A protein has these predicted regions:
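Short beta-strand/turn micro-motifs composed of small residues
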Residues: 2-3, 44-45, 89, 115-116
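Active-site glycine-centered loops adjacent to acidic/histidine catalytic or metal-binding residues
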Residues: 4, 91, 168
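Short catalytic helix/loop segments, enriched in acidic residues and glycine
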Residues: 15-29
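N-terminal nucleotide-binding beta1-loop-alpha1 segment
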Residues: 1-13
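Conserved N-terminal catalytic core of the sugar/cofactor nucleotidyltransferase
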Residues: 25-89, 133-134
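Conserved core of the sugar-phosphate nucleotidyltransferase
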Residues: 55, 95-179
Length: 179
């Protein structure tokens, strides 16, 4: 998923092309996927990220640019994808193949949402705009999911590699500390 505007990032760069440690975030995510057991990578840019689309060297499914959920729905409706589908946000510069493989190994059918404790995000000093209660704990989504047919499940991890989503310049500074 690489079509966001990145308005909270307050930069002229398209969010997926924003550089963390000198490398565009989307390149770091594509590299993590290439280093994993994932067998096919398809990007989902939008009109909000035209330079991202031309930058990528993987097949793309164009999305409408109407927000993450609408763009995800559009991508999942494309005939080139079959479920289950691993979805990954382009703003996870610490992601690597090992973490992706752990997510895939944790998937037991249906859909899987990867969560981290909200306290971990706060402890790392990164934004935690979206939190909710799950099993008596306050958690945050990571931007990594498996979308399948069937029941939904959640996987809670304390791995900072999925806890650090770059939404602000301060988040980018935190990410660079962990590279």
């Amino acid at each position: 998923m690489c079509g966001g505007r990145g308005t909270r990032l307050a930069t002229d760069a398209e969010k997926p092309l924003f550089r963390v440690g000198g490398v565009p975030m989307v390149d770091r995510v594509v590299g993590a996927l290439r280093d994993s057991a994932v067998d096919r990578i398809v990007a989902a840019p939008s009109p909000n990220a035209p330079n991202t689309r031309s930058h990528l060297d993987v097949p793309c499914i164009e999305t409408p640019g109407e927000g993450y959920v609408a763009d995800l729905d559009a991508a999942l409706a494309d005939d080139r994808l079959s479920r289950p589908v691993l979805t990954v946000a382009a703003d996870l510069p610490l992601l690597n193949g090992e973490v992706v493989d752990r997510v895939l190994d944790s998937h037991e059918g249906g859909s899987l949402t990867v969560l981290v404790p909200a306290s971990l995000k706060r402890g790392l000093g990164v934004s935690d705009d979206t939190t909710f209660e799950d099993g008596g704990r306050v958690v945050a989504p990571t931007g990594v999911n498996v979308v399948g047919d069937g029941p939904d499940d959640a996987w809670l991890t304390r791995d900072r590699r999925v806890a650090v989503n770059v939404n602000t310049i301060a988040d980018a500074r935190v990410a660079e500390q962990w590279l």
